[in-house]
Amino acid sequence: MESTLSVSDEKLTNSSTALNNCGDNKESSQVLTTANTTTDNQQVQPKSQHQQSASTEPLSKERTNISLENDLILVDPNQQSKNTVSDSVQDTTGVPSDHGKQQTIGDQIKILISSNPLNIEEYSSHLNRLATILYEENFTSDFLVTLHYKILQLMDELPKFVDLQNPLKSQLYTIIDKNFDILIKLATNYKVMEVSTASIRFLTTVFMNLNYWEVYNLLNKKPVLYHFLNLIEFDLNDCYTRFINDYQRFTYDKITQPTVKSRSRSKVTKKRKVKGDSDFAGSNTATATTSVTTPDANTSHEGKQHRSEAFFSLNPDTSDHDKYVADVISGANVQKRKFRPDVKLEHHRIIKKPQPAADKLSTKSSNYDPDVIHECQLPSAEEPHKLCLRRFSRKYELIRHQETVHSKKKKLFKCFVCVKQNPGVGPRIFTRHDTLAKHIRVNHKISGKEAKAEVAYSKKHAEVVEEGDITVHVGRRKTKVDFELRAHMEKRKSSGDDTNYMETSDLESGEEEVTFNK
């Protein structure tokens, strides 16, 4: 420490004597001496190399408590040095002065204003230090305008540190990790409106440019970020979709598809097998007994598992699908309407509206008879101790109602057009084939024979699952008229008025989304 000080013993003695003779109790935190003589200049020259190396890294932490700037020597009052200079000038109270603190912060501000970051790590630290100084306000008013200009300039330089060429190496998350708390304080409590609005705009810009995995990891580390994301209406689903679309080619090129399928199949098979065994046993103690089964049962179970995995696979083989649709369109594969026996309608009642014989038309459609109403006699899904008693004007509507609402086993119809157009996201799955037909017609703009072929192929390859494995959510937006009509019909039914004898299934024609229970 003695080798880095350019102070002569004579000057130190004179300065200490002068301080003792003053008699006042003013606190002195730093000693400022000017090297004017030629002997002092000769003492500074041997350590010029150390001064130059320290100035190349303005944002790095100082190892010593002494820093040189121009011709002045600054001694940090917060640390006790072993040299005679600090011992001779230290106040008897041992408390650093306010003047020393202001001068130390002033030197830091000068360095922060004059320097510029070179990478994103320095950029994050630089911005954090400036924001902290502004919020604490432990500086003189001379630096206020300069600090405002510098922090706004740093925020505008954000695009320089965004790696657009290689987004996989993005480190924008470090900005949020280091600066979110202090910038939120500036945005909510700082007195200068320009800096507050710039802080909110800066945080929003950084979040909008983050990758999906960066947002996910930041939310795990700081759950409080979720409130800010809601405030700026950040769409996490849209961020995930962009992540899938942007990086799909990277995943496909680097990882072969068979490897991914085999790994995922093994995990899914193991998970579903454990779940099936636990459901069959009914308790954890009886799980071990389920492993002793017949070979035929194991074979059928494995066959069902592979079929389910093929149904819900993200990238299935669509060659069979393409051939099937092409044959239907060309007429090579003629679809025959299957006969649906009335065995499916054993739990129903036919209600005929009394009407004079003179009013009956001689020509009636075989599919629709306005005088016949079909009533469901199965137990209600909401109230099992009561009958459903839903009424429909057409027989196929009652069949569809019983298959959709009352059946313990559900049929799942997959949209293979979604699979072909966007294989990375996964297929849309419906519980009703008429909803699938509407989805194909509206979303994919496919109609005619091609649409019928798509629906027929999906019905041919439908997956049958138990009722407890899925949860069906109606995704169609219902209008106010829908809810009022339903409430009116429920009121008429509870009052016992049978004048409103017919209920169509138009309100049930909305899109359905299938979610699997874990």
UniProtKB/Swiss-Prot annotation:
Describe the disruption phenotype. Answer: Affects filamentous growths and leads to hypersensitivity to caspofungin.
Point out the gene that encodes the protein: FGR15
Which GO cellular component term is one of those annotated? nucleus
Compositionally skewed regions (Acidic residues) per UniProt:
505-518
GO molecular function, a single term: zinc ion binding
Question: Quick check: keyword Thylakoid in the entry?
Answer: no
Q: Where is the composition biased (Polar residues)?
A: 1-41, 77-95
Region spans: Disordered: 1-63, 75-101, 261-307, 492-518
Q: Does the keyword Transmembrane helix apply?
A: no
Q: Where is the composition biased (Low complexity)?
A: 42-52, 283-298
**Which terms are listed as keywords in the entry?**
Metal-binding, Nucleus, Zinc, Zinc-finger
**UniProt main location, coarse:** nucleus
Instruction: List locations, semicolon-separated.
Output: Nucleus
Source organism per UniProt: Candida albicans (strain SC5314 / ATCC MYA-2876) (Yeast)
Record GO biological process: cellular response to starvation; filamentous growth; filamentous growth of a population of unicellular organisms in response to biotic stimulus; filamentous growth of a population of unicellular organisms in response to starvation; positive regulation of filamentous growth of a population of unicellular organisms in response to biotic stimulus
Q: Which Gene3D superfamilies match?
A: Classic Zinc Finger (3.30.160.60)
Its protein name is Filamentous growth regulator 15
Q: What induces it?
A: Induced by caspofungin.
What function does this protein fulfil? Probable transcription factor involved in the regulation of filamentous growth.
Amino acid composition bias (Basic residues), ranges on this chain: 262-274
| ZnF (C2H2-type) intervals | 374-406
